[in-house]
């Protein structure tokens, strides 16, 4: 890859964009980018000859088609490298979350995630706070379910702590992403299904749901039913302005911990044992 590339922007009446782009493609076969009244072309080759050809065409057509030209030489950025450098590993509780182009870190439980989005890679406040809560709540041998699992990072965290882990998501793409991330970490989930918590069988020591507030309220009955007596429910994805609405749906549980990070709230509830 060369250090520089050339960018030629042609501004013209939008009705002539197709005509001029066809002409350009006859003299230069690299791709074009279009906007209203604009044609943009980029190449590692000097595009002066294209500009000169269009100026000559414009002169030949006299004033029928008017074009303005802007030819710039720009730094050629390696976008993949630039993206990789922008994604930094993070430490959250006992966990070190890192992309595959970094090395694991000694002294932490390592989770490898190649993020497509910040959400689900540990960088988003809700995921970060859930990882901290999992660090303090989940223990080896626990039965855990991750509801709305997304990338699967929270279920992976519980698995690496020695728990039995089940995961579900209503989005089939999330289910596939979860499978890929478990494979990337050489881990094996115990159950994974497309759907929600209503398909779960039995109860769990820890139920994790990092979903938006309105959905948490909608499935609150199923979430609470899935927690065994003495177990925990970790809720996140809650904007602070909706916190009280969510709390109203879970007031029959004991609130053990509240975390506010940025504008996002994470709540850890305990389902008390019933005497007798």
UniProtKB/Swiss-Prot annotation:
CDD domains to which the protein is assigned, alphabetical: AdoMet_MTases
Record-linked InterPro entries: Ribosomal_L11_MeTrfase_PrmA (IPR050078), Ribosomal_PrmA_MeTrfase (IPR004498), SAM-dependent_MTases_sf (IPR029063)
Enzyme Commission code(s) on record: 2.1.1.-
Reactions that this protein is recorded to catalyse: L-lysyl-[protein] + 3 S-adenosyl-L-methionine = N(6),N(6),N(6)-trimethyl-L-lysyl-[protein] + 3 S-adenosyl-L-homocysteine + 3 H(+)
GO cellular component, one term: cytoplasm
Localisation: Cytoplasm
Annotated residues for binding of S-adenosyl-L-methionine: 127, 148, 169, 210
Name of the protein this chain belongs to: Ribosomal protein L11 methyltransferase
Family designation: Belongs to the methyltransferase superfamily. PrmA family.
Keyword terms of this UniProt record: Cytoplasm, Methyltransferase, S-adenosyl-L-methionine, Transferase
GO biological process: methylation
Enzyme's top EC category: transferase
Pfam family, one: PrmA
Function: Methylates ribosomal protein L11.
GO molecular function terms listed in the Swiss-Prot or TrEMBL record: protein-lysine N-methyltransferase activity
Keyword Transferase appears in the UniProt entry: yes
